[in-house]
Amino acid sequence: MAFFITFSSCEESLDIDVRDSFACDLVLSTPEQIELLLLTTYNSTESFGAGSQFWARYMNVEIASLEARMNFNAATQAQDRFNVINGWTSSNVGQLGQKWQDLWTYVRQANVFLDLVEGSEAQINNPDEIEALKAEMRFLRANQYSKLLKFYGGVPLLTTAATLDDDFNIPRSSYQEVVDFIVSEIDDIAPLLPLTRESGEFGRATRLAALALKSRTLLYAASDLHDPSMAPQTSNLELYTYDKANKWQDAADAAKAVIDLVGDRDLISTPNAKAYQELFLSANEDILFARPFGGTIFGFGTDVTTQPDNAQSPRGFDGWSLSTPLHNYTMIYNMEDGNTTDSPSFDAANPYENREMRFYANINYQGATFRGRPIDYSISVDNTIVPDGLDSFSQDQQTLGNFRHGSTTGYAIRKFQNEALGTDVKQASPGRPYIIYRLAEIYLNYAEASFRAGDEETARKYVSRVSERALQPAITASGPELLEAIKRERRVELAFEGHNFFDERRWLNENNLGFDVKGLRWTKDLDENVSFEEFTIETRPFDQKQYYLPIPQSEINRTEALVQNEGY
């Protein structure tokens, strides 16, 4: 099986180039050399750039969520890299099919590292330093298992490197067993990790990062998708369910543990949309764990570049508009006064007036000023007289911007864009991190878990900290309306960070999993007046099997004990 493969030599097992051709025993002789081996496994964390998952790194799972659709080659709408329109099969989930191999590759690398380091000369001579490095690797392995859980449900639990004498016919562990493993690992290693890091070590594991992983894991486990009485599966329920009486209180306690370490403070203040947008462009105290960027990180080259500007800028800026936000999604953003777009304060004829701050920070809409000019998605009624908009997907504008990548929804992602780069969107943005865990998520985790545990006062307090930072009113709702307010805050605050794909699933919200994908079509008349109409771009199907990805059929065929996810 692909995820059990190992090799006979030390160098092959670690699958890296050992500097200066050191023999394995020399590599394992000092903490400094072992640290170099550890650091390559940080390539397991998410990124904006190119690597073995080219498409799945230039865009996140937002293109298969309520947030966005894929927009590559928009003139023909030929690309559906995650296969969300045709529907998933056991042999085709698009680029998501790479997840299984990529996630297991780093689990194996972690297991090999931990086995080789155990009893090494470096560990004998420097036990405390080596235990700290092992704790980092165990954190990275636990993070991989958390992703395997989200995509597949219960998976085989492998904690040592396999040898040729081992039994490869290993069944999947239950969902609850994998959750318990992650939590146990975090409880063991958190005291061994530093609380925070100096700026030169930004991006390495900390106690806060480990506890944030525990918080997310327990929140997901407690959710409706994994409740035995609500799970959509009809067989092998142990692969998908979590059945602990105090699960919501456990999730609340895990989030509170992070908050207590941070100091139970307000989030970084953002007086306007520009300040909010800049939260995502550099390291700051609200970030608990992120992947840093640069030509080299910690002295070794990485397999990524930092490309959100190129991938997500509108076409007229030579961008790809790769993940175009859905009109359905943009309507979730409130008005400036805190009312919804269903309220009288929303002007349907001027949908972008008086919206909440995060709308302007996250979304590139028609008429928004971006990199020095207004965005224009409009298509002329006669482009021989009045030209099409620079950012449209008109096939007649081949000389303007990036011809193939005009937005088909009438939107593009503004979040993560560094406008200080000017018009050269292909250059790297120095210091911009890919954020994996941050404090606002923990506050929302705490609010949701507290509500479900029966503590509405705490839920209101912490969801309001997030909404008020965005200049929205404090949340005063109670009961089901409070839970919906918490969910809305997650959809908006955590936009395009890889959460919504999983959130809607764990909430069993199928209305936001299968639906008509809406956009706004902008038209320019001969007097250059612009108008719009809402239209349906496509219908996105959803089948209950799509709560999880299929395990690659090749793995199922090889291994009798490995059970396929239901429906595939």
Predicted features and spans:
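Active/binding-pocket-proximal capping segment
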Residues: Y377, V381, L421, A440-Y446, ...
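An aromatic- and glycine-enriched ligand-binding surface/loop that stacks and positions planar moieties
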Residues: E11-R81, V155, D187, R207-L211, ...
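Short, well-structured active-site flanking segments
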Residues: L14-D17, L149-T160, H226, A453-R465
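Conserved, well-structured interaction surfaces
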Residues: A23, P31, E35-G51, N73-Y152, ...
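Bacterial N-terminal signal peptides
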Residues: M1-T6
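Long, intrinsically disordered, low-complexity segments
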Residues: C10, L103-Y106, F181, N272-N334, ...
